[in-house]
Amino acid sequence: MASAQAAAETSPIAFPEWMTRPGAPLSGYGTPAQQESAVARSPMSSPLSPTIGASTTPLESLQGRITPNGLHFERHHSGVPNIDPAQHELKIHGAVRRPLKFSVDSLLRYPMTSKFYFLECSGNGFLNLLDNPLDASCGTLNGLVSCSEWTGVRLSLLLEEAGIDADASWLIAEGADAASLVRSIPLEKALDDVLIALYQNGERIRPEQGYPMRLFVPGWEGNVSVKWLHRLKVASSPAQSRSETATYTDLMPDGRAEQFTFTMGVKSVITHPSGTMNLAAPGIYELAGIAWSGHGAIARVEVSADGGKSWAEAALDAPVIDKCVCRFRIPWQWDGAPATLMSRATDSAGNVQPTRAEFQKRYSPGNMYHFNGILAWGVEASGRVSNVYV
């Protein structure tokens, strides 16, 4: 034993290659480690055109509340336009006393406001409305939601400068992409907390997020936060555009379609462990996930490991912010038996996340918007985790 110890003490230390030579030079803009290249958005393109579709945030690979800009979900109706900011203008007109035009540079001179908000596509989670559960990752199923620090000019400041007519009650926003997305917003909301967003997480918003400027409507369905914003019309009635009649409406059981379901309901999802993951062995695991609500802040998240028979309250990461993603955590002792993991969120307005069955009862089977039902992951005895319905 003594000779072995002596040999170990005299053996040369083996250094890994990265400790024996200089590393990469300085760079103008940082990028993720090449070993993390698999952490990426998942694209879902339309069969009609590669420019129509969405890409989802890999929720299962992230921690904290902020989504990196390069992983923030995308949703486009006609691809990402290549806009020259020097030629781009925002026009405010209609029922105003003083029509206005703003260049990008002129808006950058206004006082800025920064807020942490989630953004969620109204179609997020539509795959969980399929008849049979899809075996896919958390991000693929639920990743049309992201959270950022948004910085820009309060819309109320610009509208006050334009002077609103007394009979006006709506604001109609139009994007400068080829689809010319048009959405109507009640003036009361526009004068409350809406931003003309110019920055995301400290840097200028990226093209897929609306460069050089986008409308940002906190807590409301993502499509009203019109990207590539170039026109705001103050009016006495909504535009009744295609995106307010043929799409982005909720199909009801009696065959009617309900318009203007703006606010995103309270929702939560366990991100780890989640779909397509594998638990190595029985033992203690941390069940972690995110919760959010367009009605306010998250007040409570409960977690179940037995398919909803019993619930335990999870810890919420501070600070808990209004209309912002909140991360929750709770330890779980897995005994190796099959389990069903679920989370249920309650917001500051008293709204409780419904079950999948409760959500489906409200709407027609063909409805694909505003799904906020409780989500479930099944854990097999082998440790494999998959999407299940409860």
Predicted regions located by residue number:
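Structured, non-membrane catalytic/scaffold regions adjacent to prosthetic-group chemistry
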Residues: 9-390
